[in-house]
């Protein structure tokens, strides 16, 4: 195993030429390190480095929550983590189907035959051999080697499972940020990985999500006893990490329903619903207006239960 790991590291050193990811793992809890992406859209300049993913040191291996946007990104992340503990990767758990979170999977599958876990829609919507938005947005140098690989296991129901001595709870919540989201909780460490159900420091993109689904998911997350919460995007990992998301979706629901009552119509809703409390957050100008339009379409005929 040692010789194989040395060979992998030598291969990494050679293959990381060209586009360079400058990654630095941050320790967030005992035996948990995360890589935090930029609060930007994916671009040629950032190589898709705009989401968070984490390494958990288990008994004899690393277990990952998401894997990043490219093969080369995953290489760079593993190279940094091998400096902390020289361990293989045994499992990669994906939180949802958006490609900035899982296109690093094939690095871990090829190098370690890691078991890949995630939502069924990921396999249904992305087939081997296809190109995703990252293939279209990023430079060839950054995306080189990145391939879609099938998951080994689909997460369909709430379950607690022990992987290499570490206990994880998988909590599927249905359509929240994406068409089907899962968050992961480590009860022994009191660490929760929310995926994109929680973001902070930036505005979320709700292009495939639901306001009601987000609020439902956030209510479930709030019931868990966590000391650390890792958002899908953002740097706040404290007990207050989800406050921005709760405020945003609560206000969005309230104001959209007021707009419906005022009969603004879809064309006039953005003049009525401005969400100015969030105007200083990253990507507000880019994402807030589409979120308002989508929320109006969702809630136009909503009746409070």
What are these regions (language model features)?
Residues 31, 56, 66, 81, ...:
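Divalent metal-coordination and catalytic microenvironments
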Residues 79-156, 160:
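Active-site HxH/HxHxD metal-binding segment of metal-dependent hydrolases
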Residues 5-14:
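Sec-dependent N-terminal signal peptides
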Residues 61-63, 67-71, 160, 167, ...:
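Metallo-beta-lactamase
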Residues 36-50, 135, 142, 201-210:
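Acidic/histidine-rich helix-loop elements
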Residues 30-80, 184-194:
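Conserved beta-strand hairpin/beta-sheet module of binuclear metal-dependent hydrolase folds
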Residues 13, 223-225, 236-305:
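Accessory terminal helices/loops
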Residues 16-20:
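Boundary at the C-terminal end of the N-terminal hydrophobic targeting segment
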């Amino acid at each position: 195993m040692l010789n194989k790991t040395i060979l992998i590291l030598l291969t990494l050193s050679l293959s990381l030429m060209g586009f360079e990811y400058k990654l630095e793992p941050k320790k967030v809890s005992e035996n948990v390190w995360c890589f935090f992406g930029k609060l930007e859209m994916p671009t040629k300049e950032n190589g898709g480095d705009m989401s968070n993913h984490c390494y958990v040191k288990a008994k004899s291996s690393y277990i990952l929550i998401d894997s990043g946007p490219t093969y080369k990104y995953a290489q760079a992340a593993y190279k940094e983590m091998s400096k902390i503990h020289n361990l293989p990767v045994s499992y990669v758990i994906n939180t949802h189907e958006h490609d900035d979170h899982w296109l690093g999977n094939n690095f871990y599958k090829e190098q370690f035959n890691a078991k890949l876990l995630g939502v069924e829609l990921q396999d249904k919507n992305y087939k081997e051999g296809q190109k995703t938005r990252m293939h279209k947005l990023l430079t060839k140098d950054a995306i080189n080697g990145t391939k879609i690989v099938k998951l080994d296991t689909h997460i369909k129901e709430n379950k607690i499972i022990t992987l290499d001595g570490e206990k994880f709870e998988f909590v599927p919540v249905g359509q929240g940020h994406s068409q089907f989201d899962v968050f992961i909780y480590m009860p022994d460490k009191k660490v929760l990985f929310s995926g994109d159900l929680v973001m902070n420091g930036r505005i979320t993109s709700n292009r495939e999500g639901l306001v009601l689904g987000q609020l439902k998911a956030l209510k479930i997350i709030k019931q868990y006893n966590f000391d650390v919460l890792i958002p899908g995007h953002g740097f706040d990992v404290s007990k207050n990490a989800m406050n921005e998301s709760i405020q945003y979706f609560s206000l969005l629901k309230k104001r959209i329903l007021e707009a419906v009552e005022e009969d603004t119509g879809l064309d006039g809703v953005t003049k009525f619903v401005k969400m100015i409390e969030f105007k200083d957050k990253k990507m507000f100008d880019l994402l807030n207006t589409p979120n308002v339009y989508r929320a109006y379409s969702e809630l136009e005929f909503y009746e409070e239960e």
